[in-house]
């Protein structure tokens, strides 16, 4: 602190927590803005007309929102809000698998419009191209494997 002239490590920890809370709060705020603006109703109407399997639909919407906003938090919360009315009649197992598909879609191809991309780049001291090849490709693999695993679970559990 100031009196003993020691570095204030505690302040750095508080700052990290504040940034995390602000990011989550901003993600929730953007989600609500998208819902209030009618984006969710438009996507729901298109989704209902697409006649797609629930898991693929959930994954694709989450991917689209992740790419548009750069935030996995926004992609997750907004996709869940959009699909909630359509998924109301699903069994608990099916709802859980839809949530997993949303989570998998929300991490698809992290790129320059995502704060996490820049954090990884700085933390590991990577160049932009390296970050795309390492982090973005890894995130895409995680997302696709997550979707495949969720589809397999749907096949065997429902």
Predicted features along the sequence, with ranges:
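Single conserved hydrophobic/aromatic residue that forms the stacking wall/gate
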Residues: 1-11, 15
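Structural signal for alpha-helical transmembrane segments and their membrane-water exit/capping regions
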Residues: 3, 26-35
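Helical membrane-embedded segments and adjacent short helical loop/helix-boundary regions
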Residues: 12-24, 35, 52-54
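Hydrophobic alpha-helical transmembrane segments of multi-pass integral membrane proteins
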Residues: 25-27, 50-90, 102-103
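Membrane-interface interhelical connector segments
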Residues: 34-52
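Hydrophobic alpha-helical transmembrane segments
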Residues: 55-60, 99, 132, 136, ...
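Alpha-helical membrane segments and immediately flanking helix-loop junctions
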Residues: 65-69, 75-83, 95-128
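Juxtamembrane and boundary regions of transmembrane helices in multi-pass small-molecule transporters
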Residues: 105-158
């Amino acid at each position: 602190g100031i009196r003993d002239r020691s570095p204030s490590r505690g302040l750095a920890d508080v700052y990290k927590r504040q940034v995390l809370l602000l990011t989550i709060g901003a993600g929730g705020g953007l989600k609500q803005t998208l819902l209030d603006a009618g984006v969710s109703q438009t996507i729901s109407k298109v989704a209902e007309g697409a006649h797609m399997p629930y898991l693929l639909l959930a994954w694709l919407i989450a991917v689209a929102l992740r790419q548009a906003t750069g935030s996995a938090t926004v992609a997750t919360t907004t996709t869940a809000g959009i699909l909630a009315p359509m998924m109301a009649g699903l069994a608990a197992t099916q709802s859980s698998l839809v949530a997993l598909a949303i989570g998998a879609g929300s991490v698809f191809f992290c790129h320059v419009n995502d704060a996490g991309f820049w954090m990884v780049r700085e933390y590991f001291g990577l160049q932009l191209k390296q970050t795309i090849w390492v982090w973005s490709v890894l995130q895409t693999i995680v997302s696709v494997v997550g979707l495949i695993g969720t589809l397999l679970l749907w096949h065997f559990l429902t």
